[in-house]
């Protein structure tokens, strides 16, 4: 039987030739010796003939970080590794030189090879070996067996490391003594050959700025060690003398910039080296290096940086008078860096009464420093941007109060001066009985009018200090209506609603049918509230639409004479704004659910137009979570609030989910679901709402697009960020982020990243990590909310059902609110 073998065709031959040409070119470029084989990552030299006489280096003498392994064996003519030879291979990790003629390793041989992890120098001609080539390397293995070491002090360092079990495995290393006797290295004894020691004269170096100090370093060891000082980043002038023992270091005119630096004394001989260190503490007078006008964050903050040692005491002054701090206005130190303190004066909901000059005084026993900054938080009422005031009714009497106690930082408002009609003198005792009766009747009627007219004016009543200082809000949600499904819709069009800082078009979802005014529920009836039944107490905040006040509302509920409410005003009196106002009121009237903030009605008697919502005692959920988290002790004074339990977190989460189920059933898309837009009432009752104020209070949560639009991108899915597409599925994504907020006690999502970095992470498919206190079942639920494709996300009803089941499995105790 004849077998046929196909001969290589010309194409295959050409390919093989090309490969050989490429390999040959690379080999030539590297300068690979004849006894070596070279690749892009490895050099292998094991052929004894013709052999190599020096360590292989690249022909172009440029650094190469691709080669990670060099293996050399059977090279009897290779006797040394010199400076700058191995240094060309900066990426080298493994070096093997075995069964060769190696006699010498330069002390600078591996100075550039910081990645070296493994060195094997076995079976060579090494009679001595210094420690210096290896002291800066983080080696996992250094193998030195079967070398003709000579018993001397120079190899004592190898014994010391063997004794301290520096290597993963003990090695049988031998040396030859003066009698040509071969002994184990571990049994080697060399007189006057010890590891040196070093001791500083002072380990608590303290000096006043501008003074001088001298430090001594006493060393011992055999052979006598060389001494050096390590003075990294030392700014002050200094002199050292290491020619005698003890060595000395004198620092002159010490600078405060050197406070906190470490000063080290190093003693080194051929056995090894030791280092001892002490921290330099410089005492100096305070210096306020930075102070700036207030910036809005979660609270208003006047930022500052103060240097000083000992730690300066800080005192604030307002308009020249001492500012007594309280829970509403206090100094917070955020970062301490040696003797540098970064912090701010934090003000909770300041008003125009807090405008003025603030002076910071920093003082310690070495001196003091002060800096002043002007602060403007709010315009004075009555200048066109203040709250609604009837000048004929109210007289504002401002008393210079202690601004530190914000519960007393309100205008003292006098009640209307009710003038009682003076009693008319009797002209004669003979006035007819009929006229007397008529006068009495008139007086009775006047008294009745005065009695029931006391609440007939819409304005602020009484000092605001009697009301809780919590911020609370609720707001319109967004119904999916017919119109353009692009963000380029006319801002002033009929489908635009006021959202925080701007008007944003209502986005159409083609899966739903739109709803117009004619399609509202037939029984839709917006309750109208008389203006004289609304009495403002204090301002809660301000959005683009206008201001929000805490108020008392009379005759709203049959069972109560008056109740606390949140009042939202409309400052824009244009026709379009009024149309939006009425349309919004009709939509809100249809939202009736136990976990949606209740809308009571409107007041349209005169200007401004007013919406009335229920008031939630404990404010927004984000502040509530922070106040009941592990970091609450950093923010609170006095008793620390009780920390939320896992079951209470689940109870909160399932209430929010219940509210979102209802909104989805009504074809509403929230578009700004976050803990800052949820409110907390009695017995851990949580409701969804939003006055739009959160864009002012939580400004860092929003990303400004163009000149006006602010988007909560940390809560938005990819399709909303990239295409401005808002649907029930995008609300599901936001609900997952809300769950993450709850189980982190109110942390900001992606708090470690800038807004641009957050956009990049979300659009690239990254998700938030599992919170430390979060059960796996809840995190799996979060991941179900964060699927990139909207149709792959969990259904809102599924989420509510899962949270309900988890909450039922863990009973809730509601005494957290006291």
From Swiss-Prot:
Residues 534-803 form the Protein kinase domain. Residues 196-281, 295-364 form the Ig-like C2-type domain. Keywords: ATP-binding, Cell membrane, Cell projection, Cytoplasm, Developmental protein, Differentiation, Disulfide bond, Endosome, Glycoprotein, Immunoglobulin domain, Kinase, Leucine-rich repeat, Membrane, Neurogenesis, Nucleotide-binding, Phosphoprotein, Receptor, Repeat, Signal, Synapse, Transferase, Transmembrane, Transmembrane helix, Tyrosine-protein kinase. The modification Phosphotyrosine is found at residues 512, 698, 702-703, 813. The neuronal activity and the influx of calcium positively regulate the kinase activity and the internalization of the receptor which are both important for active signaling. Regulated by NGFR that may control the internalization of the receptor. NGFR may also stimulate the activation by BDNF compared to NTF3 and NTF4. The formation of active receptors dimers able to fully transduce the ligand-mediated signal, may be negatively regulated by the formation of inactive heterodimers with the non-catalytic isoforms. The record marks 813 as: Interaction with PLCG1. Glycans are attached at residues 66, 94, 120, 199, 204, 226, 253, 287, 324, 337, 408. Residues 400-418, 481-491 have a biased composition (Polar residues). Detected in embryonic brain and orsal root ganglia. It is found in: Cell membrane; Endosome membrane; Cell projection, Axon; Cell projection, Dendrite. Pfam families: I-set, LRR_8, LRRCT_2, PK_Tyr_Ser-Thr. InterPro entries: Cys-rich_flank_reg_C, Ig-like_dom, Ig-like_dom_sf, Ig-like_fold, Ig_I-set, Ig_sub, Ig_sub2, Kinase-like_dom_sf. The active site is at 672 (proton acceptor). Belongs to the protein kinase superfamily. Tyr protein kinase family. Insulin receptor subfamily. This is BDNF/NT-3 growth factors receptor.
